[in-house]
Amino acid sequence: MKNLEPDLDGRFRKALSFPTEAHLNPRDALVKLANYIENKGANLHFEQDGYDASHANITIDARGLSASKKLAGLRGVKGEMLIIKTDEVRLSRPVRMLHPRIPLYIVPRANGHFMVGATMIESSERGRITARSMIELLSAAYALHPAFGEAEIVEIGTDVRPAFSDNLPRIIKQDGIYYLNGLYRHGFLLAPALARMAREMIVEKAQPELFIQKDKDDEPYRQRTSA
């Protein structure tokens, strides 16, 4: 602990280290991903631009909970988080804390900012944070280091994660549309794998592990095999 996170030295008896675990700022990642695909020649269109995608040859729907009216069983799991700021604590990696009810973590960001998250509540409400959640998140930060008790609360965030009953992602072909959904808490982690499966399915006609076919008139996809 002293070598990895000096500011936490002496505060905890035991900890586990995962040297290859990475973290990112999802907002920055979205901007960079959009710039990347535009630089590769793709065009980005948005609903407010009046773009009509109904005439596209292939449509992939990855809108999360916004597709719930089309996908039976897709539910929302609410998540709440805080961004706090202090110059009194320095962390170089995410720190996860054991919690009796929810897995809490604190992720360092630039300029003394830390993201504290995240709750898991069976609800599709996405507009407010509860007092209980606020207390739990702040208590977790304070338990990690008392200096967080004097931190500035910069932002309060709430939204919902799309999930099916088993909390596993799925690729569904329905009404001519490919739906990639149900990534739950693991959107950025699983998105590359689902994108690969979708490409293999559309281009190579291979059936991915997570595929559910609801268009009965389609030709069957060949079962994907692992090398």
Can you describe what each PLM-predicted range is?
Residues 1-35, 39, 163-164:
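Flavin (FAD/FMN) cofactor-binding and adjacent substrate-gating region
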Residues 4, 22, 42-55:
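A conserved short coil-to-beta-strand element within the FAD-binding core of flavoproteins
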Residues 5-12, 53-57, 163-168, 173-174:
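A short, glycine/Asx- and small/polar-enriched loop/turn
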Residues 17, 119-122, 183:
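Short, histidine-centered active-site or binding-site loop motifs used for metal coordination
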Residues 40-44, 145, 198-206:
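Short, hydrophobic alpha-helical segments
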Residues 55-65, 195:
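Short hydrophobic core segments
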Residues 63-175:
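Active-site substrate-recognition segment that forms the wall
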Residues 151-227:
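C-terminal catalytic lobe of FAD-dependent flavoproteins
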